Amino acid sequence: PLGLLICFGRMSKNPAIRGIVSAYISVMRGTPLMLQLMVVYFGPYFIFGIRISMGYSLIAVFIAFSINYAAYFAEIYRGGIESISAGQYEAAKILGYSKAQTFFRIILPQVIKRILPSVTNEVITLVKDTSLAFVVAVSEMFTIAKQIASAQTTMMPFVIAAVFYFVFNLL
């Protein structure tokens, strides 16, 4: 949903909105996710002097992942919408459809069909990127596997984590 909203901002006829959203997308896609996690986690403290609570690390991970992946999804959605030929819009107008009806009944179903492979790839990448959450002290599966492996001097926790990531991405 956030990616679609950003997509509409990127496609806006208003140059100010389009420029701001384009800059946001460029920053999110042009900087590492790990850096974004650190900025979202440490930013409130260093910029505003707000104390970081114990539960904030998970919230920071959700915020950073949401704003990062929304930019990627926005570009996927934009590519899908712009790939629909002008004839589709013209046909809907001739049939008397409103702009909303045109989008939801004609354009969106075609867009979904076209973008589904790209969206699936991004979701797989998102699942794998969750291992970066350790940067802000969120114990996710890879961090726990690393702790167990170092305590037991065995590779099995890494193998189990790899199998889990692989199986989860098959779904």
Label each residue range with its predicted role.
Residues 1-171:
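Transmembrane alpha-helices and adjacent helix-loop boundaries
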